[in-house]
Design a protein with these regions (language model features):
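Specific aromatic-rich, kink-prone transmembrane helix
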Residues: 172-178
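Transmembrane-helix signature of polytopic, membrane-embedded enzymes
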Residues: 102-111, 127-156, 175
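Transmembrane-helix signature of polytopic, lipid-linked glycan biosynthesis machinery
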Residues: 19-30, 157-165
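Hydrophobic membrane-targeting alpha-helices
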Residues: 21, 92, 96, 100, ...
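Interfacial juxtamembrane loops and adjacent helix segments
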Residues: 27-36, 40, 44, 52-119
């Protein structure tokens, strides 16, 4: 590996470790309930039903008389009101979290599925930085370094949504345009 690539990898590793140190892990093992914050719960239920049930039937996650969710008149079942996009991107993490939870933590109250769900936003945050770097290099912007892209991402406030409000769509939107 080139020396420059090793330095870039070292910078990304240090930044990743820094963000992992400031990430609050304690609340990540409690799944949102239908009465929790509407945004976070809505996106989580999209991802959960795709990653675990492999369908779009929310009846096993939501009650029909919940005030945060609409009822689809065609099927008379509750449906989260937020778009499904981030749920599609984070569903593979829930799927693998479910496998890990069933293999190793079957009798525990620890919710590994929700922890894996929270890691999806962090994964897409760092992949977005990598893709933006590649895009700028391919477009011929040689003066924009990897560190500048990291400054742009961190300065935009995106780490807050990746590490604290991981259920919202901000990180997934940046990934989509990277």
């Amino acid at each position: 590996m080139k020396v420059k690539n090793k330095k870039i990898l070292a910078v990304y590793l240090v930044v990743f470790i820094f963000f992992m140190l400031i990430t609050k892990i304690d609340f990540r093992t409690v799944e949102p309930q239908p009465y929790h914050s509407h945004d976070d719960a809505s996106y989580y239920f999209h991802a959960y039903t795709l990653g675990i049930d492999f369908d779009l039937d929310y009846s096993n996650q939501l009650s029909e008389n919940n005030r945060f969710y609409t009822t689809n008149n065609l099927i008379s079942k509750p449906v989260p009101t937020h778009p499904i996009g981030s749920g599609v991107l984070s569903a593979p993490f829930i799927f693998f979290g479910n496998i890990i939870e069933n293999l190793f933590f079957n009798d525990s109250n620890l919710r590994v599925i929700y922890f894996f769900y929270s890691m999806s936003a962090i994964f897409y945050f760092f992949i977005s930085g990598y893709l933006l770097n590649k895009t700028f290099k391919n477009l011929g912007y040689k003066s924009i370094s990897e560190l500048n892209i990291l400054y742009l991402l961190v300065g935009s406030g995106l780490p807050y949504f990746a590490f604290e409000r991981f259920g919202t769509t901000h990180v997934y939107e940046v990934f989509g345009i990277s």
